[in-house]
Amino acid sequence: MMRPDWFNPPLLPGMPDFHDSVEYLRFSRNLSRESIAHEAGISVSRLNQLILQRQIPGPKVFDRLVRFHGLSPAQRRHWEDLLQPSRPLVSADELRRRLIAHRVQDHLDVLDQHEILGGYLDPLQTVLMGNEVLHRMMPGLDQADYNIIRWMLTPAARDRVHGWHGELLGLARNLRTALGRYRDDPRAQELFHTLRKDIAFRSAWDGTPMQVTYDLPRATPMYLRISGTSKPLALNLEINEYRACSEVLIVHGLYSTPAIAC
């Protein structure tokens, strides 16, 4: 279908929202609600209720919208999160107390001895506890309130991270999944509003509408520029849920030690 030159799809600049995303998909395809209802097998009145009255779809209507828009499994899961009540976040201080009680510092110390990056993150990608290797790899993290996304927007991160823009896009996709779950929590809203003040984050967020990442393993390494090395250092990250505390992710970073002057 040819679109007029003046047509521009709307952005999804705000916190993740099911009803906003349904309208975004409609506008991005330049379709009327009537045409979507007909093609998806939904009554026009029901679709209008979903959008205008912000009602929750039943399973059949939900499935038909997912199929009509060709959503990926991750996008479907994101919609499912958005239709569930927002979850409360456990405070960073409380999560740190739990980690200390589990003596995770002992594990971090062992990782330092083997030159392996180690850290524990909350759902908003704030480093709750990290070892010396992590802080060496991420200079100035403390000045970003220990939040990885905020750190990525600093000059230090731009200098350190090879392929910085692509990494920022990946973080935006990961953040969208977390904000979908915790969207009404004041900490989540405060972080999002803080990030929106940065033009690079706004560009990354607005440029990846409906793009989400749930898979924890990374298929490719993260490349860092390290002083004294001729090539960017390939850091292979392993990310898993911390079994002793489901709200926490544990991160390990592996690289070839001969490649860096320790």
Protein language model annotation of sequence segments:
Residues V212-C262:
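Low-complexity, glycine/alanine/valine/leucine- and proline-rich hydrophobic stretches
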Residues R33-E39, L65:
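Short alpha-helical "recognition helix" segments of helix-turn-helix
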Residues I116, P123-D215, L254-C262:
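PAS-family sensory domains
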Residues L89-G118, L195-P221:
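Short, basic/aromatic recognition patches
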Residues G41-P57, V66:
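Recognition helix of helix-turn-helix/homeodomain-like DNA-binding domains
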Residues V22, I36-A37, L47-L50:
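Conserved hydrophobic/aromatic packing and binding residues within compact polymer-binding modules
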